Amino acid sequence: MAQRIFTLILLLCSTSVFAGLFDAPGRSHFVPADQAFAFDFQQNQHDLNLTWQIKDGYYLYRKQIRITPEHAKIADVQLPQGVWHEDEFYGKSEIYRDRLTLPVTINQASAGATLTVTYQGCADAGFCYPPETKTVPLSEVVANNAASQPVSVPQQEQHTAQLPFSALWALLIGIGIAFTPCVLPMYPLISGIVLGGKQRLSTARALLLTFIYVQGMALTYTALGLVVAAAGLQFQAALQHPYVLIGLAIVFTLLAMSMFGLFTLQLPSSLQTHLTLMSNRQQGGSPGGVFVMGAIAGLICSPCTTAPLSAILLYIAQSGNMWLGGGMLYLYALGMGLPLMLITVFGNRLLPKSGPWMEQVKTAFGFVILALPIFLLERVIGDIWGLRLWSALGVAFFGWAFITSLQAKRGWMRVVQIILLAAALVSVRPLQDWAFGATHTAQTQTHLNFTQIKTVDELNQALVEAKGKPVMLDLYADWCVACKKFEKYTFSDPQVQKALADTVLLQANVTANDAQDVALLKHLNVLGLPTILFFDGQGQEHPQARVTGFMDAETFSAHLRDRQP
């Protein structure tokens, strides 16, 4: 008897295993969103805990979590740090796995108040769910005196994370600014003033006084960074508006033009004179006097330092990050002060000779500043035009560097010239494709010609108009990574296009996830994307042919041969 039961169990297991082995490759093995991201909440007076139990093999996007109160006031919601996840289309993003607990402090809630929670996630296997929205009913909460102003979850964190420069760049920029024609010749004079004209100070004493001077200058710059970052944080949403981004890009361009020598940008001469007189009244050689001199020097901007400093300040305002703001300006001042410290200790023998090269350093920083408006405009004009602007900047910079290097007499500069010329030729490729239409022609040849639909009625009408032909419906969204992989790798394949030559191709873009999109997905019983459906000539779907998840061109071609009606 026991042997028969054991044999029966083996047969049942074998059946399930073979069913899994020979299951359709496109059949869905993904769970509904509520099972992938089990959401729950618990409120205790002012304290509300939102929890997500995330199924193994799935993850939530940190930047897609939004919390909106209705008839309630909540404190600032601090999203915990996630783990970094990278894909080829969206780059690095922070995600949550396993479990997420999000505490929310409710300052006040009226009767009938609610909290709308929106989130979105994907599966590691290449399947993304539409944004999920949950409504959390709130118990009535009376405001207390300590209640803070209501704010919403910061939604601009992804912009901060994507800023193109780190604080270390500020240190390098500060060092570079030290070698511009407005700054470098002043260092011997500043060194003498800092030491109070005393030539017999010990090396340690001279280094200490110079360090104190640099710290005074750094204090001024750090304070500027903190103030600007705090102001940027208050107006963070406004600073992301397209008109504001365009305005900032124009300002950055003007700052770069000043570095090219088109005009001079500096503080009014009367203010500079007043600050200089204040500095001269300080006693050189004493720590207190030297510190004040450095702090005042931070306010006296020369024509060579005004534009880079203004660019960094505007950059910090965009970030709204006070730690970044203070840190960048501190490192910027430290970079400017390092050559001064070396000159004070070792003398002028370390100081390079003045010459035209200092103007070239200033011009090079103009190109660095020009990178910032392109970074800002990419959010407005898109990746394609952004690439063209980067191409134009690269051609301009490498072309200028090549022409400048022709003045050099040393033999090894010929190698540098060849490298610069090659870099310019590589940089011009996106502009060449744009001018001669190569990219457009390639896209025309490699992309399927889909007919777009939006609603259930439009789908039904398209099925009727197919007139007996088989129909393929592709459900697409910008937030679906695998959908973009389908476009780039699968739909561009000649074998796939040939197999679909006699098929009516429909596509529904559900990026907005509005009411019509939700209704369409519900009508088709679609859990997430990518999902591709196949209909026969009578407009009836073939459920066994449905594709969920990514397929490469070879697998999809085989699926079309085996499954398509």
Curated annotation (Swiss-Prot):
Q: What does this protein do?
A: Required to facilitate the formation of correct disulfide bonds in some periplasmic proteins and for the assembly of the periplasmic c-type cytochromes. Acts by transferring electrons from cytoplasmic thioredoxin to the periplasm. This transfer involves a cascade of disulfide bond formation and reduction steps.
Q: In Gene Ontology terms, what is one molecular function of this protein?
A: electron transfer activity
Species of origin: Shigella sonnei (strain Ss046)
Sorted keywords for this record are: Cell inner membrane, Cell membrane, Cytochrome c-type biogenesis, Disulfide bond, Electron transport, Membrane, NAD, Oxidoreductase, Redox-active center, Signal, Transmembrane, Transmembrane helix, Transport
- One GO CC annotation: plasma membrane
Q: Which GO terms describe its biological process?
A: cell redox homeostasis; cytochrome complex assembly
Where would I find the Thioredoxin domain in this sequence? 434-565
Superkingdom of this protein's organism = Bacteria
State which Enzyme Commission number(s) the record gives: 1.8.1.8
* Compartments where found: Cell inner membrane
Q: What is this protein called?
A: Thiol:disulfide interchange protein DsbD
Segment forming the signal sequence: 1-19
Q: List the disulfide bonds.
A: 122-128, 182-304, 480-483
Q: What is its main location?
A: membrane
**Which membrane topology describes this protein?**
Multi-pass membrane protein
Q: Which reaction(s) does the protein catalyse, per the Swiss-Prot or TrEMBL entry?
A: [protein]-dithiol + NAD(+) = [protein]-disulfide + NADH + H(+); [protein]-dithiol + NADP(+) = [protein]-disulfide + NADPH + H(+)
According to the UniProt record, what class of enzyme is this? oxidoreductase
Q: Where exactly are the transmembrane stretches of this chain?
A: 163-183, 208-228, 243-263, 296-316, 323-343, 365-385, 386-406
